[in-house]
């Protein structure tokens, strides 16, 4: 057998490759020491070396049958969780995950040693430590569909935080499509017909779901819709698009972009929302009394993290395993009325 095959490697095969008994492999995997257990260091190192070479990861269900329940939940983020630009996305999620783990009496293990390839962390690598956790929560705007498919094929207990297209991967997500269509529909009912959508440059499901919501609301109408990729790094180009296209409504996927454009519009003498309405398809958890009250989506990310933990706990349970419908669920996304949307006072400001 090749030591680099991608299918699941069994403990029996590990034992054959290392020239030891299957019981020895089990003892090494579970770090059993003390008492009458005596495994020479050379033997232990040989078993660990084969484990690394074959990319072996223990089946969590087998670990539970063997009485190994660490009460540890792993957390893997495809993007760094703590840089300032990521805080608004990850902080409420991690708060919810922490609260859920506390309710269950479990500890959290954040996987940080994974390699970065093409700007993205890789879940599978030669020093994979997934076996240290009973189950794993996956976080990220974009996830590798090949890795998700492999997790499913190899029977890992995982839950993705956010909707995923990959078949059979359990997830708890937010229904961005319905909420986006609803809030944009409100704007159209007020009379907006020239709409500019500033969207993120990402193929993540949540990004595509918001875009689909915009399309659902504006299709089969007389709305003139323009869209532009924007992460807020080129405010001048964003503003130039506004002055050229002359929309009465700007939809900004990023709350930071919405804030920057609001400030620029006010500086240029625009009355928001009379001259220019702005909708944000997200919310910042860092709110102060002086902040603009945007008409916006308010994703329940703390609840999302907590619900994902609960689903993972049920996947690990022998008594409360979720039904097929419960394995992939979407939470409704609240809409904040705010103060940046009103009927246009004219077709468009030149």
Tell me the role of every PLM-derived stretch:
Residues 1-6, 68, 72-185, 189, ...:
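Alpha-helical recognition/docking segments in bacterial nutrient-uptake
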